[in-house]
Curated annotation (Swiss-Prot):
It comes from Xenopus tropicalis. This is Allantoicase. One of its GO terms (biological process) is allantoin catabolic process. Its EC number is 3.5.3.4. It comes from the Eukaryota. The gene is allc.
Amino acid sequence: MSAPPKENIGLPVSEFVQMNNLACESVGGKVLFATDDCFAPAENLLKKKDPEFKPGLFTEFGKWMDGWETRRKRIPGHDWCIIELGVPGIIHGFEADTRFFTGNYAPRISVQAACLKPEEITFQPRKDKIGTAASIEEYKSADKLKSEKWSHLLQMTELTPGYAESSHSYFNVNSKQRWTHLRLNIYPDGGIARFKVYGIGQRDWSSCKPNDLEDLLSMVNGGVCLGFSDAHYGHPRNLIGIGRACDMGDGWETARRLDRPPVLKADSKGILQVPGFEWAVLKLGHPGLVTHIEIDTNHFKGNSPNSCKIDACALTPTEEEGVKRDERFEIGYNWKPLLSVTQIHPHKRRYVESTSLALHQVISHVKITIAPDGGVSRIRLWGFPRPLP
């Protein structure tokens, strides 16, 4: 069990942890600078996979740890690193995971942020840094950014040791600005296993021409998961990830439904006649007119759904604010069919052209329903950005 969430002003933890991890290595997040990487490099902070512990495994510098761990500080100051977000955007919360760092965790952290231009970054690529501290040249590159003056998104606050019942600490952020880089400060030294940055990607849509075809649902373009019925094996936010899924864990997968019939039957089109289904609701990065859809079950060879349908609606931000507290996303959502019930197949991409779509108007939200259960790796909604009517 996680430690009780630490909340401030902003979204509750239960909402922001459904959002995208803007700093994950799988979406391009990377560490540009770290004061020290003695026991374990800062790059481990951004790994997508959960941290692991290997008893008895040591490097030439000390115990092998799956996280960022600095040396015991014996000089003035504290340790910190600079992280470049893989997807710039609006940040709603942080998660600091100290798992397995029990007697060596960082007792306090703070987080600062900046919105930088590419030409402001002058760091050389980091190589294998274990056992080292930052060089004079690396400090010079860091000093140019004046990161100590960046905006504080999280003031200094305490973490908890990396035991199973206390390793996760959550912090919400009340900021509407777009950020590209973070400075993670640890006080004074120690280790953190993972650092997640929950938020919504934000791109400059003003540069997009009316006839530019875009994936309106992609996390890079600001798509975000708002809710779902089940995420037993994989979260539906993975549906809008970058590129094709790397494995089954990089998709949305539900548990097997217990209400499925003892003997399955199908109609003449091969659609299973089952009572149950699973769903996920997502918000497009920009309202738009969808022209074709891609449903990808890559890697799901024995556990893909039998069928999928997609409903859509158009909501202004004010309307969305008024209805989003309905946990089933039914009250206040005027759902209309976008894609009727369609059979899908294991480990394949299914393309649906415009002529097969049931709705040809601007939409802002979609509800993806699969039956009876199973896994989908990606959903792409290709179309043209348009303002809401």
